[in-house]
C-alpha cells in the first residue's frame, strides 16, 4: 500500500496534479504503520510480536518492501535490510515449505539481498528439478506457471539491479557464473545494457539510453555518473 501511495503521488507530481485525491492519499499514507524490528532482530509481520504457528511458512508478505518494493534498501535503511535477512533466514532454517509461486519470490529476494549463491541454488534445486518440459513447475502435484515466472527476474537481479538511485552492475553474481555475457537488459531510467565478465570481473559494458539524462552506475562500491543522450550508446 505504501509503495502504491508513493508511486501515485510521484506520478501526480510529474503531471502537475494537486487535488483533493492527492491530499487524501497523503493523509492516508501518514496513517500506515512503519516497518518495525522485533526483539530478536527480525522484521515484524504484525504490529504485535505474535508467536508463529508455522515458522517455515512459504509466504513472506512482510518483506515486500525489500522485494519487489524498494522502500527498504541497503543505502537508506540498512538496519531494515538486516531485519529482512534475519526474517528470511529464519523461514529457510525452519523447514521452509518451498512450493508454488513463493519460490520465485524467495529466489528473487535472495538475489536482491546479494545472496547470489543461495539464489542460484534455489533455482537449480527447487525449479529445474521440478520443471515440466513446457517449463511449468510441479507445485504439490499440479502444474503451475507462476513460480517459473520468477526465474528470469531473479537471474536479472543477480546481474543488474536498478531499484535505487544507482544502477548496480553484477551486484549478486553467483560463484558458478564466473564467466558470462548478457545483451539487452533493461534498467529503470530507460537504459539498455550489454555486459561481459570474466573470472567474476566486469570487462565491458555498453549502455544505450532511450530517453537521455543522468545515469548513475555502481560497481564494486565505486560510482560513476554519466550524462547520456537519447538513442545513443
Question: Which residues make up each language-model segment?
Answer:
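Non-catalytic C-terminal accessory modules of carbohydrate-active enzymes
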Residues: 117-232
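Active-site core of glycosidic bond-cleaving carbohydrate-active enzymes
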Residues: 2-166, 203
